[in-house]
Amino acid sequence: DEKSWHPFGRDISENSQVALHISASIFYQLFGFNSSLYDFVIIFPLVIGSLTAISVFAFVRVLGGTTAGLLAALMFSISAPIFTRGLIGWFKSEPLGLFFAFLAMYLFVSGIMYNKGKFSFIKLIFAGLFLSLGLSSWGGILFFLIPIIIFYLILPFLKREKNFIIWAAPVFSVSLILSLLLFERTSTFTIGYAGLVVGFSTVFVVVCELIKKFSNESKHVQNCFIFLTSIIIAMIGVFASGIVSLPGFRYLNAMNPFLTSLDPLTDSVSEHMTTSISTSYIFVSVFIIFGIIGIWFLFSRKTIDLKIDKRIFALIIGITAIYISSSFVRLEIFASVGLIILGSIGLAILFKKILESNIFSPTKILFCGVILGLFLTPVILPEDLSWTSWAEFPPTILHGGSFFQISTNDWPDAMNWLKNNTTEDAIIASWWDYGYWITTLSDRTTIVDNATVIDWQIKKMAYSLITTPE
């Protein structure tokens, strides 16, 4: 794309969300119904976000049952961090990435937790494919690799099937790696840190199954633990040697929230601000209560009948999601994901216990009323700052990034003025927030834009804007 990042241009295949473009194109051909492409992509994130609720239901249903799945879909549909990243007009990476990710997670857990032969084989293959599509749509989907890898490291200590895990884990991993090679941007993951940890964890699963097969049963845990220690030391050694490059700063920051202050450019972006306690409560509110209930039940041995592998996977993905979200305000979307999984399972267990008990019927009705009240509170209160009021905010281009629910044509008119009053070969210097608008609506070349491809070029632009011309 020679109209962005002048004079270098942008290699779309190398650093763009190609799966988003391909998916939008396919959906447009199937469901465009003679509408313009512009109108279609405005509606696209809204439709995909709605469909994601179905994949959330399917995923959580495998972990906690049908009631938990339905509650998860409900919580997903009213979660402010999620629907604010998928509003009408938000043709960005998160909605489609989450859709593919939850679909992949459903196929993964249903494939690896139930030995159904060829059906598990097919599910695990498609799980790898859809997760790679999610990664191509949004880099943040790398998060979903974390619980899978941790689960791999715990899997040999949980599963007793001698011949199932030894092929199930490699099938998913190979499918994922081969699918990542479909796109230039994601293919770099296979030879980088992501491919390394997936490869090491898969080797660990296979070798542990072989160890259990050829060693005394009394020494299974001991031998697997020794091998796990050696795998971790080997991974640390590879990273320390520099053979494999470390993740980018944003990904390192997600693992260590305190790194934010080390990079002024990252810290200057409003959505990259470190999450505060008050901000977290605004975003997830009563979901925190539901999540705590879920953690309590999942750690309890006597009160629930969920299989140990399901409980552990739910705890892994829930707790890691909450931890990752502490890095950036933008990543509160993962706090919501974690609390939705934990909270829906916790509420499903609580509902079952209360409604099946011998408690006086009015008490059961009161309990349902309290839960309903907790659900409704952040949705309708406070009046001007409720979650539903967030959905009424127009796209940024219509309100200039202000905190007021206004809608003006100032920016569209400005883009139209640029298009009609500058030459076609004009190069527009602006802050990166406006690069996409100028390129797409004004059809003019820009120096920086929202892709933040070249950090030093953004810094030079910032210096130019804040200094006095000589």
Predicted regions and their residues:
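Membrane-interface coil-to-helix junctions
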Residues: 1-51, 79, 92-93, 99
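Membrane-embedded helix bundles of polyisoprenyl
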Residues: 43-62, 67-115, 119-157, 168-184, ...
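Extracytoplasmic
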Residues: 51-54, 355-470
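Membrane-interface catalytic loops of GT-C/OST-like multi-pass glycosylation enzymes that act
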Residues: 89-93, 186-193, 325-336
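Hydrophobic cores of alpha-helical transmembrane segments in multi-pass inner/ER membrane proteins
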Residues: 101-109, 145-151, 198-212, 287-296, ...
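Perimembrane helix-loop-helix junctions
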Residues: 116, 144-224, 349-353
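Hydrophobic/aromatic-rich transmembrane helices and adjacent perimembrane loops
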Residues: 315, 320-358, 362-366, 370
